[in-house]
């Protein structure tokens, strides 16, 4: 699904500005020759690539606006779709005379193959166009739509984005409402008491494609589940633009996604 949308400004200077209250817009922008920090930021356009789950998505943002996004929900065919979708986004930018200034990629954890495809695509574009690379942790990407759609969350709420792994295992992290890390990303075997230390003290919101299988296991009264949350490229831009302002870039030559676990190849059941 390709969507070209009118500008929507709800990023750095809008509804998500509280995600990083210590950063001011002007002070953190690098100066470039002939441009003030504000002028330089106004020109910045970022290509976003997200391939950590079965959904493949790309997006373009500029100055806190989401200007283009495309999503493919038809299953894990990233090797076919990712390049086509990225090229379509770059063509859109070119046709509107918008120079792309950086590439942001979802850094994991998630699908080993999906992450590898997305990282390879992002690195290739960065290398070919001499662009900086930005890496955004996948759990943080999932937090963005939650904070946008649920701005009435209690001040002491904790967010637990979950990516489905095998059986009752999930890749999860714990954040507060300002996306400060309460607990680092880890692989959790979900049982009734897995998050008890947080649930006893805070309302905790679970979401992501790994949360559905946890609903019947985690029955604490402080546990809340939010459906329909996936890591999508269109939700990367508030975080990517913060990284752009900070100059928080990766070395494209050596960047590797955060797989969390080593790849395990499944044995085919078919007789050779």
Task: Name each model-derived stretch.
Residues 226-272:
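Acyltransferase
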Residues 89-93, 128, 146, 236-244:
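Stable alpha-helical structural segments in soluble proteins, enriched in small hydrophobic residues
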Residues 3-4, 10, 15-18, 24-26, ...:
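Short, positively charged and aromatic/hydrophobic N-terminal segments
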Residues 41-42, 65, 74-77, 132-231, ...:
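Surface "functional belts" at beta-alpha junctions
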Residues 104-138:
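DPxDG-like acidic metal-binding loop motif
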């Amino acid at each position: 699904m390709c969507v070209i949308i009118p500008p929507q400004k709800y990023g750095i200077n809008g509804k998500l500005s509280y995600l990083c209250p210590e950063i001011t817009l002007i002070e953190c922008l690098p100066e470039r020759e002939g441009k003030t920090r504000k002028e330089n930021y106004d020109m910045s356009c970022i290509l976003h690539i997200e391939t950590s789950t079965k959904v493949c998505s790309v997006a373009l943002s500029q100055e806190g606006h989401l200007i283009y996004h495309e999503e493919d929900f038809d299953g894990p065919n990233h090797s076919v779709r990712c390049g086509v979708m990225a090229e379509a986004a770059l063509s859109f930018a070119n046709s509107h005379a918008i120079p792309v200034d950086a590439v942001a990629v979802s850094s994991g954890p998630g699908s080993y193959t999906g992450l590898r495809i997305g990282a390879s695509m992002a690195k290739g574009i960065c290398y070919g166009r001499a662009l900086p690379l930005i890496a955004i942790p996948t759990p943080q990407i999932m937090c963005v739509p939650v904070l946008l759609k649920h701005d009435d969350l209690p001040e002491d709420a904790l967010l637990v984005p979950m990516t489905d792994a095998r059986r009752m295992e999930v890749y999860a992290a714990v954040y507060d409402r300002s996306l400060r890390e309460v607990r680092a990303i880890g692989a959790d075997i979900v049982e009734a008491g897995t998050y008890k230390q947080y649930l006893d003290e805070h309302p905790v919101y679970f979401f992501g494609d790994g949360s559905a299988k946890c609903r019947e296991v985690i029955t604490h009264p402080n546990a809340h589940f939010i459906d329909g949350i996936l890591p999508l490229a269109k939700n990367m831009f508030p975080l990517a633009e913060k990284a752009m302002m900070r100059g928080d870039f990766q070395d494209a030559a050596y960047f590797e996604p955060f797989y969390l676990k080593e790849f395990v190849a499944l044995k085919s059941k078919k007789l050779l």
